[in-house]
Amino acid sequence: MNLNRDDTKENPFPMKKEIEKKSSGNRREFMIQLGTTVLGTGFLWSLPKMGLAFPKRKELTVKEAIDIIIKDIPGAPFERTVDQLRSGSMDQKVTGIVCTMFPTLTVIEQAKKIGANMIVAHETLYYNHQDETDWLEGDEVFQYKRKLLEEHQIAIWRFHDHWHRRKPDGIAEGNLKKLGWYPYYNASNPRLLTLPEAQSLKSIMDHIKVHFDIPKLRLVGDLDQPCQSIYLAFGAIDSRMIIAATQELEPDLILCGETREWETVERVRDGRLMGKNTALAILGHELSEAPGMEFAAEWIQEKIPDIPVNYIASGDPFLFY
């Protein structure tokens, strides 16, 4: 289930009068009406198929949940990985799972509000890839965040390396499904997407902005140029890797989350000044991978049906002025 910001605001019973009118009828009908009116149709996932006796939900520890999630990923569990438990205990019982891109303070509070005590986050908790904290001990923001997690007893497990190593890459599959481009995915060359026919760069950008809910993006290129081959570099991909792929594949467009401006950006600019056709679109790290974590929530829910799994967007941190 996808929880947007409005789902976690106060006043959880905005249609109280309407529900009260229906409460005099069949008890089960009333419960279904309550669930669909207040929480949306996703609430029905937690209702029993027959009768009123709610079956006892199967209990899982954090470790058991993690083991289920990574079970079918090739090579898992990895010996060296950033996918570690960064908060909480492996032994604590899971009451609910939230998937997100960045485990921000807002996401933590929203998870607590819906009764979830495990956050599966794609990116780092403490502002560096390895989540090293020695250098942050004197930082008041770090201290506040750590204390908040302790108070709420929330476990945070990072789901980065394993999700990318899934076949297909979990982020890529979620992104391409969101764009309606998954039928064009090529397993033999997963980073190169070829559309059925060329489209203008403008039409592709408009399509991405709508489906990824991106208000603004940065672009090196000509909006009128035709594009058919797209190199996928969601998130943050090493510039040398992108430049090497550009040399070999000569894609019409590089679609990336973020990149150092003096590297890939300048290589694309100089290439265009020479007469090359490759354009570059920079979506932002969070927004370029968020649909992949929304997909992760659906994927994990199928594997762990007894525990509610929700997606909460961490959101774009930038204000465009």
Q: Where on the chain are the PLM-derived regions?
A:
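Hydrophobic structural segments
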Residues: 3, 11-321
